[in-house]
Amino acid sequence: ASLNYWAGQLKTGAVTQAQLIDLFMEQADFKDRYGPLVRLYTAYFRRIPDYDGLMHWYKNMYPDRGGKGLSLSEVSALFSQSEEFVLTYGELNNLAFVELVYKNVLGAEPAGRADWLNRLALGLSRGEMMIGFSESPENLNSSRIPNSITMAFAGMLRRAPQNVEHAAWLVELK
């Protein structure tokens, strides 16, 4: 629907401001595009994605002029080779990578370490492994509120929340 339509809905009281925000946040083209990218960012770097970085990767995944953008798997592979990742964690062997993923994404000890090491040895990429964790039911559940805050700031304010803002909203929404 157009901007005029939603403005009319607000003006007539058909929806409240809060309801409109909820409607926008639940739109598939917003939630299904930004959500996986925000979760992936958080899984790799354990921080709120900066707005410019988030938009850079979003635009690479969903180019304005059509055409084929990067897949989430390709972005994940690039994250695993990024300067920030290497400077933060160093060069990691597969065991260290598996342990890092469990810690960063699930905050848990690597209970399935042997299985993931075997999958990596058989050719699973680190990027695909990270997506498996960032899109896991456990992470989807535990990251829902924090990532919703980040996505709301990006979608409505065109910026990332500052850490103090993010923390305040976490307290408010939990």
Identify the meaning behind each predicted range.
Residues 1-174:
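Composition-driven recognition of low-complexity segments enriched
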